[in-house]
């Protein structure tokens, strides 16, 4: 009986794992300005030719013009200034596929430059689902903005009850202010277009072939502080759940640990790592 049950469960388990296995590492092909990548306890300087695995956090500065990520299927994500994004976020598989990015804040331009459709991205207020074409997305504290530069895309407005979905058409712009329901206009205003990062305004070709068979040794960057990661650590539960394992080495730093302890109520999944004695069963009394 047990073997029969296991044989029935195995295909389901494989299906759940498939989206994570199928999404290849992203390749950095353009770096115009400073950027860093946080891969577990490692902090790296982002450089052209660097491969970024699942759940790697990329951070650009206010002075960064563009960081381009390419996947083998010809899909791309360009990151603009003052942006934080997670590559291939494994905790956010939806509809049998994982998004290319979780955009915590800042600017991203997504495009499908090959035959494959783009898997989209997730931001705090919107889920941009799989599409063909090119989209510009901005995620801010009080505003979310999606412009269908070429083609269209299905959008899901997150954290609304009842759930709200819409189909963004070519040329349209979607704007959502804070947690209110968003609106769609037939085209962006000149003021909106002026906000688009200048690095997004030119059509850039795929460059992955230039890095074929080239090994890039990543330079180490300064280890992230609690303040650097705070917005991630107190973010969505699906993203936070693996962080105690992924960032365990960082908790050995006194200042980082102090930040975790101070804000433990915002990320309680860290408690077993910080205070393992609270989860140890008391020894049985002698008889």
Model feature map: region roles:
Residues 24-173, 178-262:
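Flexible, surface-exposed loop/linker segments and immediately adjacent secondary-structure boundaries
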């Amino acid at each position: 009986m047990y073997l029969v049950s296991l044989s029935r469960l195995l295909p389901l388990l494989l299906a759940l794992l498939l989206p994570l296995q199928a999404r290849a590492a992203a390749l950095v092909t353009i770096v115009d300005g400073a950027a860093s990548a946080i891969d577990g306890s490692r902090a790296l300087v982002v450089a052209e030719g660097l491969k970024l695995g699942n759940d790697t956090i990329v951070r650009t500065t206010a002075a960064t013009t563009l960081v381009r990520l390419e996947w083998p299927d010809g899909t791309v994500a360009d990151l603009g200034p003052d942006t934080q994004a997670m590559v291939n976020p494994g905790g956010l598989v939806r509809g049998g596929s994982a998004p290319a990015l979780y955009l915590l804040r800042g600017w991203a331009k997504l495009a499908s430059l090959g035959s494959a459709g783009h898997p989209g991205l997730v931001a705090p207020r919107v889920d941009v689902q799989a599409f063909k074409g090119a989209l510009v997305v901005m995620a801010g504290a009080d505003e979310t903005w999606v412009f269908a530069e070429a083609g269209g895309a299905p959008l899901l407005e997150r954290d609304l009850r009842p759930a709200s979905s819409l189909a963004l058409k070519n040329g349209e712009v979607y704007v959502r202010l804070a947690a209110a329901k968003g609106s769609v206009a037939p085209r962006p205003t000149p003021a909106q277009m002026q906000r688009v990062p200048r690095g997004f305004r030119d059509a850039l070709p795929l460059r992955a072939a230039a890095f074929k068979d080239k090994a890039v040794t990543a330079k180490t960057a300064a280890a992230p502080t609690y303040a650097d990661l705070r917005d991630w650590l107190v973010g969505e539960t699906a993203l936070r759940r693996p962080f105690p394992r992924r960032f365990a080495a960082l908790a050995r730093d006194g200042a980082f640990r102090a930040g975790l302890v101070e804000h433990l109520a915002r990320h309680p999944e860290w408690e077993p790592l910080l205070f393992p004695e609270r989860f140890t069963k008391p020894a049985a009394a002698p008889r």
